[in-house]
């Protein structure tokens, strides 16, 4: 399978990596009135793109760069590289519910990617953490094994940052799906800039990677976990 087809699989919402049960915070935003329609959805998507979207994309690209380099060097320090990458993701996710969700998504992605592109790297990921490595590390590993570039992997990450909440908003608010996807597409120039910034940062020290978050969304994520009735996991 070509790298392009692999990226299309990884970016497809039907790829069984668990993303369909998450709203990327939209369920909380709808409940507390931050997202009520198309205009506020666009604001939310832009905010997510420039905060968590940038952070995750940089972590994904950094994972591709470092895992590729370690494979070229013979995998002698692979376990340490995975642990270091995973720790950088952990440090950038403050709320326990979001940390748990990221590990579940990473574990699921590792499992399905191992079936699609069998490679010993996935066994190393599974051995690195009992609950699974964080999703950006797993996505980076899947990109490496399938032959995708840091730019391609970061683009998939940004695609998810936009489309996960956009599609959840359709379900929660009954928005016009054509309008919702058009909003996401209209942000393409900004998304391209985020990908470029993420990949540029990924070539530097891990400690200097972006660490942008949305504090209000993080607080809402903790509250969301206490709800008795909810449609999405996050």
Predicted regions and their residues:
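Short, contiguous, pocket-lining structural segments
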Residues: 13-17, 21, 33, 51-52, ...
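Generic structural signal for hydrophobic core residues of well-folded globular domains
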Residues: 28-33, 48, 52, 63-68, ...
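Glycine/small-residue-rich interface belts in oligomeric ring/scaffold proteins
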Residues: 3-74
